[in-house]
């Protein structure tokens, strides 16, 4: 367990995502092998990082479990960079985001840190999806639009403003770009979850699970050889 002195990520779903996503994807890879395995390797340190992202930097060295997680993530991260040098860009961006959190918090501009985190995550998807054989341009834009909804959701909970939840209707219209983008309609569940939840951690758990569903969905499409852009061109024909 993570030391109680640490500020555990408010998402609280990092561990859920880490365990489930790789349990499912490994099973899929056994059925059909391909370079998607490289994408899975790349995402291991990302999800390990999510699990401790909001931990207090000054106290991290006091927790042997967190140190072990960072060590494993670093080893796998190096292997990922050997697979594709572009991965180095995303890892460096994540590190900059992690260590700049105290500064942005001090000047009360944490939204900059959050925006950089979204860009880093979308960039990660762009690299891995391209590596898996999918042109990820449209998907990356749609993913960014979906992730912005997470911030509206958290703000809605903190400020008790249900109006902010209305943004989560926007991802539903991504289906106009591609019929397979219907998966982003999962954002509607944010509305119900936020209204029913009495603690932010439940909203965070739901958010992590929703992201997990999207990741697994895209990986399955990759293994099935479905090109999202080709499907989109047929849709608009």
Q: What is each of the regions a protein language model found here?
A:
Residues 23-41, 75-89, 123-141, 174-180, ...:
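Helix-coil boundary and interhelical linker segments in multi-pass alpha-helical membrane proteins
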Residues 89-165:
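Membrane-proximal helix-loop-helix units in multi-pass membrane proteins
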Residues 1-43:
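N-terminal signal-anchor module of multipass membrane proteins
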Residues 19-23, 67-77, 115-129, 165-176, ...:
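Small-residue-rich segments of transmembrane alpha-helices in multi-pass membrane proteins
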Residues 5-12, 161-237:
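C-terminal transmembrane helix-loop-helix hairpin of multi-pass membrane proteins
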Residues 2-5, 49-61, 96-110, 148-163, ...:
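C-terminal ends of transmembrane helices
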Residues 35-73:
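Glycine/small-residue-rich interface belts in oligomeric ring/scaffold proteins
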Residues 57-65, 79-85, 110-111:
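Helix-loop junctions on the outward
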